[in-house]
Amino acid sequence: MNRFISILTICLLTSVGTFAQLNSYPLVVDVMEKSMLTIQGKSNVVDFKFDQPGEKFIKKKMYITASRRDGNLYLSEKNLEIPVKNFMSSNKMALRDFHKLVKSDEYPVMHIELDHVRLSDEPLGDIGDALIDVTITGVTRRYTFPVKAEKNGSNFTFDIKKSINIRDFNLTPPVHMMGMLKVDEWITINLFMECDILPVDQAELIR
């Protein structure tokens, strides 16, 4: 499924008063062009960055249902598939090494699945922690991703960032030039999302 639902609605759900009286809440999410997934890394010589525009792995318009139980947020759609070969970088050598490292021919897609979000008491800023399963080269690991958000009317921005160790996925950092160039085992995954979020009934009124 080329659908990303995992974090987009947290701010709205914690700030809409009627949600407290509902078991579920239907929403319309319009994803903006600035949305981006970035993987950052470094070696002992140079830093590198891989970018993938949101349009490559997220539908522009999504209809979702969210529910809140015991202070946790659950979503009806919770899977994200990231095509590995859609990443771009100005460092072509690093990008080739990345494809080789994650075996992009054998495993062309990275999988991210949201279990749930533990909501904080803050409607904005640090709004909670997302428990997410990340699958790379067929190996799945669970991480806690902190979620930050800002709101301006129906426009929301979400900033989700986490440093992980590639050895968690049984991957070995590349080494070049007889050991003179070594890639660090830590990478930082950063998902930035900008979107408009409205309850379905309000969205239908302004169509």
Language-model regions, residue ranges each:
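Low-complexity, acidic/polar, glycine-enriched regions of mature
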Residues: 20-207
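Bacterial N-terminal signal peptides
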Residues: 6-16
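Positively charged n-region of N-terminal signal peptides that target proteins for export
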Residues: 1-4
